[in-house]
Amino acid sequence: EEKDFSFIYIGDVQDSLGGITRQFLRKTLAHNPDASFLVCGGDLIEQPNHAYWNEAFQSMDSIRQTLPILTVTGNHDYLKGIIAELERRFSLTHSYYLDSMEGVNQVFTIRYTDMQLFCLDSNREFFHLYTQRNWLERKLEASKAKWKVVVLHHPLYSIRGKGNNL
């Protein structure tokens, strides 16, 4: 079913302790009161630890009660180590990840009216990106949505040619 709608996209927030995300989101919503949902392109937090998660939760709580928030993973949402591991609070906070993992990849798709969002995790090791690409090709082929939007943390194309992610 087609109907007009709008959504808000924010990316690479990396809010610091005592940061301005809460005020920014309130102003953004005040200027876009009819937005159907909010999409975040990752990095809700600066560091994956309790203090930063607490700040992010406080910033999002009042919004989350009235507006759905979809978030893809950013590199700051991962614990640093030999193999990057997604901070547990991320998938507990954004529970749609728990039902939509493709192997070890954090991917999901959501349809809203005649638009379908395909959300990828561009932070994974290189070999995982191939399985995500295969997942995306299958989902795009099966989608009947008029509008198809792919969301990931890193740009597909960069003005620095060597930074292209396709």
Indicate where each model-derived feature is located.
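Active-site clefts of carbohydrate-active enzymes
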Residues: 154-164
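Extended active-site neighborhood of metal-dependent phosphoesterases/phosphodiesterases
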Residues: 1, 50-148, 162-166
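Acidic, histidine-bearing metal-coordination/catalytic regions of metal-dependent phosphoesterases
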Residues: 1-14, 26, 30-34, 148
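Short, flexible loop segments at the rims of nucleotide/cofactor-binding pockets, characterized by
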Residues: 14-18, 46-49, 124
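Active-site metal-binding motif and surrounding structural segment of the metallo-beta-lactamase
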Residues: 29-47
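Active-site neighborhood of phospho(di)ester-bond hydrolases with catalytic His/Asp-centered motifs
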Residues: 9-11, 37-43, 68-75, 120-121, ...
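Short, solvent-exposed loop/turn elements at domain surfaces
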Residues: 16-20, 126-129, 158-159
